[in-house]
């Protein structure tokens, strides 16, 4: 018997999301206009809380849908205007271009990145050294590329290697369901569990590496570009401004990587089983023998394009998104990717997040129009200039660990800029606050997958169930990094940021605009 019209509509609404989640969103949509009539300020904060809730529940439903419905309603009832949303989007066009073109551009360099991580995995036998190499490689790549893409590449390597060994362990040559362990021989099971532990630790080291590298440059994370634009900094300026905090944090983060592997804490320390290494080495040798001259040329071309990318970013030869577009054109032209559908696949990863970011800007417009953050900013600005830095860092960190850091970074840098333009703080203090906001947004956010887009991407990937990486386990494995990165970042903001920045100015390396 066919279901009723009402039941059909209910099932279609937000698809596979749980019924309680659908009901919660409907309640939000009914309550918001009523509260807005009574108190626009309270309604504005309620909208922000609801939006953060949709981000926290990203595994139940992609936040673009519920967040978009809330944003559309906010414009309809007058919490902000469509014109203001357009202005916010226009002001952040560079960020949208970064997400659209840079992420897609790096997609066409995946073969080179896969080659690099495969060589690392099979060439280095020491687990401590291998973990450090993955962390450093991910950090370096994330300083110039998009963190999501770097994690996507490492996931591709891990899924590929897991699949190779899983087929051997289940004594099957054809493609099988990787989640089906029913055909695994008993003596392979222990080895497979050890291999899962090994891959889990590598993935977490790589994920944290993207955060360590991503905070250092203006293209490492989308919010960095927003902050750099608000402060008027180019690539080199941004790197130097952040370095009093980011360099000590990077060093301590890498030491943490070695420590947890050495002491086998928090689920780290599992080594690559020798049986697995033999299987993977055989497969790699076979692949190398089958690699044609055309394949080798592709790798060389991608490496040259990588050099162009780093050079163009460092010298600020064009807007970041346009440099990404040049990478797409060069990579596709010189590696023979000419089919429209093949090119289109490169954009599937970035466009949903680009659309979500546009919804962020709608909520930012509400925050500005309803002056929601004014009380918090006033509280922070009443403190001494020295204390302001730590307070901004802490407030950013708390919110970033449960919400998306692009959203948080955008809000706080807008408020700080408004305070500077109104004369509440000096330009010099504003530039120091921009560093505190950027580091506070990026570093503590490794605490949960909600804060780091790369972590959320890993958690929702096909790899996570294969290696038994759950939300709780990810939070537990990230804990040592969360503590070290957050505390070292706070100490650097408190004690090294102002004096080192002053010294840079005296040396003539940076200047206040």
UniProtKB/Swiss-Prot annotation:
Q: Mind listing the UniProt keywords for this protein, alphabetically?
A: Antiport, Cell inner membrane, Cell membrane, Ion transport, Membrane, Sodium, Sodium transport, Transmembrane, Transmembrane helix, Transport
Give the matching HAMAP family: NhaB
Q: What is the recorded name of this protein?
A: Na(+)/H(+) antiporter NhaB
Its recorded reaction(s) are: 2 Na(+)(in) + 3 H(+)(out) = 2 Na(+)(out) + 3 H(+)(in)
Which residue windows are transmembrane per the record? Answer: 23-43, 52-72, 97-117, 120-140, 144-164, 202-222, 238-258, 303-323, 348-368, 391-411, 447-467, 475-495
Q: Which family does it belong to?
A: Belongs to the NhaB Na(+)/H(+) (TC 2.A.34) antiporter family.
Keyword Metal-binding tagged = no
Gene name, Swiss-Prot/TrEMBL: nhaB
- What GO molecular function terms would the record report? sodium:proton antiporter activity
Q: What are its GO cellular component terms?
A: plasma membrane
Question: Which species?
Answer: Shigella flexneri
Compartment list: Cell inner membrane
Which NCBIfam families does this UniProt record tie to the protein?
NhaB (TIGR00774), PRK09547.1 (NF007093)
Q: Highest taxon of the source? A: Bacteria
Quick one: where is this thing mainly located? membrane
- What job does this protein perform? Na(+)/H(+) antiporter that extrudes sodium in exchange for external protons.
